[in-house]
């Protein structure tokens, strides 16, 4: 199931309303969410209630998904790298059967990204499972956001083969990076990645440049995601407890990464480097969009004034 396009409208998210915090405080909370702090830690640090932070995440995530859809268009990308990163909701997939009160959507959850290798812009993202359908939706979305023929690089996940073919047909240069791994380290129950023992580049479609068949940039970005979103941090209890909020956080982070955060090597935002933005956005801009979507307050009952 794809959670990138959330079913609730902005009005549905926001119409419940709350006593508004000052804009500066709201911007601080959104910034801390994108700087790797958990919601509980933010509540302690800012003296803002946990429930208020959850509501702010829902509102911001919904607005940020819309802003990404509107602004990341007509991207002049020449090389796109795609990958998927693992996390889990409520509990890991292998423990769902034994978990107490596990939700229907508990278990593994995957975030797919397609990144412009030159500008480092996140062109497309998707939160869902690791199925072929998820790969198809990602590739279809990338196709709709770029302007010219592109070289695509992915890992060896078989789901990409049909997805790239279906989205681009023969109008693409596509290569895969196939990694070979050694034996799983012991003890098996302890987290530690297997050692990569070899890498093979495979031409799949068109005429990809072998020198640029690579997933290095998107893999570095995977680490950036884990650093900036607490729910992606391994070996902690900061994991997501609700899939919708996981998707909201990814949407908020994506706008932050593309339009707000200064990229350390580019010295500007990826959106500015890609030519789809001329200046930095701020969290205050996000808050303004949230407030603009809020329905007007209902008028109270009419009270006749008493004669003086």
Residue ranges and their predicted role:
Residues 1-308:
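Residue-level recognition of single "structural anchor" positions
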